[in-house]
Amino acid sequence: MELGSGGKTMESFLSSSDLLLGFVPVFASVLALPGPNAAFAVGQSLKYGVVRSLFVPLGFMLATGIHAAMVLSGLGVLVLQYASALVILKWLGVLYLLYLGFKAFTAKSSVLAVSPQPMSRRAMLTTAMLVSLTNPKALLASLMLYPLFIGEAGSYAAQSVALGLVAMVVSFGVYGGYVLAASLIRRRLVRSHLANKIVGAFYLGAAGALAAK
């Protein structure tokens, strides 16, 4: 028995929904692996607390949307042809994280809660985007992962938009979780003389993880 246009539309929708549901745990597990994004999120949360640091997962979320748009529009393959530009961007990100780590290690105050010149929310958001966008392996992982969850049935454009939006929500949830988890131990570190050293270690860890990519 042949399906009418309405039946085919419903079948296409269900197929796309199944693919999206399958995408969520796979993508979340990839993002949850320790790396430069996670280290930067933890470092910012330890230094500034959960409320201000929510701009970090927001920045990662926007970067995820950019990666998704690049891959699903076909621009990702084109960008990879300019490998030297990606390398330059990556090392700029590494140098900036090293700078943040150096500042944390040399900070005179050991009290995290009273930073004389706290990073602005805009700087936090743009730095998070920079950390994520200068990671070549993030783009490579996106190139390999996203096409697997686009079904043959249904509109490619509609599926791409849905997949990109879901990826952004998952990204915010995963890195928001890192920020929240780090904030839970922040109270114990606020008065510790090692507080800034610990924050600096996370920044340096993020730089090392990005450099190793």
Give residue ranges: language-model regions:
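Selective transmembrane alpha-helices of multi-pass membrane proteins
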Residues: 80-109, 168-178, 188-213
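Short, conserved phosphate/pyrophosphate- and ester-handling motifs at nucleotide-, phospho-/glycolipid
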Residues: 35, 135, 200
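Juxtamembrane transmembrane-helix termini in multi-pass membrane transport proteins
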Residues: 13-87, 144-163, 168
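Hydrophobic alpha-helical transmembrane segments in multi-pass integral membrane proteins
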Residues: 70-72, 133-143, 203-213
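Short, strongly hydrophobic alpha-helical membrane anchors
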Residues: 1-18
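Membrane helix-loop-helix hairpins that form the core translocation module of multi-pass transporters
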Residues: 51-126, 181
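A short amphipathic helical element positioned immediately N-terminal to and/or at the very start
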Residues: 125-133
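Hydrophobic/aromatic residues within the transmembrane alpha-helices of Major Facilitator Superfamily
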Residues: 28, 32, 65-66, 102, ...
